[in-house]
Curated annotation (Swiss-Prot):
Functional note: Could be involved in insertion of integral membrane proteins into the membrane.
Membership in a protein family: Belongs to the UPF0161 family.
Native source organism of the sequence: Actinobacillus succinogenes (strain ATCC 55618 / DSM 22257 / CCUG 43843 / 130Z)
Parts of the chain that traverse the membrane: none
Region called Disordered, residue ranges: 67-88
Annotated membrane topology: Peripheral membrane protein
Name of the featured protein: Putative membrane protein insertion efficiency factor
Main location: membrane
Keyword Cytoplasm in record: no
Compositionally biased tracts (Basic and acidic residues): 79-88
Keyword set, alphabetical order: Cell inner membrane, Cell membrane, Membrane
């Protein structure tokens, strides 16, 4: 069963898919991370919603530069937000 997404989530997902289909093939692979930043963005938005997902994606994109080695950097699980708050 497909999850229903808010309008904001749908717009962000379509923008990322546009990038993946149209822009990324033109510029070639450049991401230093696994999953790629665009795949990370899709997963973050689907998992955390439009606002938090966009924030996580922006932070990830800002880390993707030549001075960062990259590597495996998965989207944090949704329950991670609550566990950090409970530990305070």
């Amino acid at each position: 069963m497909a999850a229903s997404h808010s309008l904001g989530e749908k717009i962000l997902i379509k923008l990322i898919r546009f990038y993946q289909i149209v822009i990324s093939p033109l510029i070639g692979p450049r991401c230093r991370f696994v999953p790629t930043c665009s795949c990370y963005g899709l997963e973050a938005i689907k998992t955390h919603g439009a606002v938090r997902g966009a924030w996580l994606t922006l932070k990830r994109i800002l880390k993707c530069h030549p001075l960062n080695a990259g590597g495996y950097d998965p989207v944090p699980p949704k329950s991670d937000n609550h566990s950090k708050e409970n530990k305070k």
